[in-house]
Amino acid sequence: LVRQVLAGKTEDYPNGVTYRQGDKIVLTPNASLFSDFAKTGPPDYDDYYRLLTELGDKAQGLDRILLYEGSRGCWWGEKHHCTFCGLNAQSMKFRAKAPQQVLKEIGDLSQRYDAVRFRLVDNIIDMAYIDNLFGKLAEDHCDLDVFIETKSNLQKRQIKTLAAGGVKCMQPGLESLSVNQLRAMDKGVTPMQNIACLKWSLYYHVMVSWNILLGFPGETNE
């Protein structure tokens, strides 16, 4: 899109881009999803860090966290779409980079920008990342500070691995401690599993960001 605009080719745009043509709004939907994540590299933050350098002292104290995307879609939503979720309107299909690729790209970003804080923007991490990404980061004694979103039915061993691999905060999608509400949401977890997730996260010093969702049809005070 940017290349076409810079070249002055404004008579047509790539599929998936909404644009104005006279008094009309035109959109040609994408015929297919972008699915081959292996072909994409890490994000380029060169301009951002160049600007920070130019700002000098004015940029001191800024909370610098690099955003990184390892997957799109939701592997749980492919099987059981949580009834409250409005994400992934285009497709729930789960597509993920291989753990080895993510490991290399995060390592390259950390080295290039002298950064240790990362926020994975995936709706839900690939479960293979627990052992094959964070387990490897733990083995290599990488001192990172990572945020992830994941399903809440994690085992003690898995939370221990995540913590050792640098996960300092996570959003496990607890949503409720009521069995009736969890069933209504089609979350695929029990209140006890959610409590266990909170317990072992506290034990391994992983901060948990979570919510209680209210207002479901048929909900009672109990």
Please give the residue ranges for each predicted region:
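Active-site capping/gating regions of soluble enzymes
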Residues: E222
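Acidic, low-complexity intrinsically disordered segments
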Residues: L1-Q100
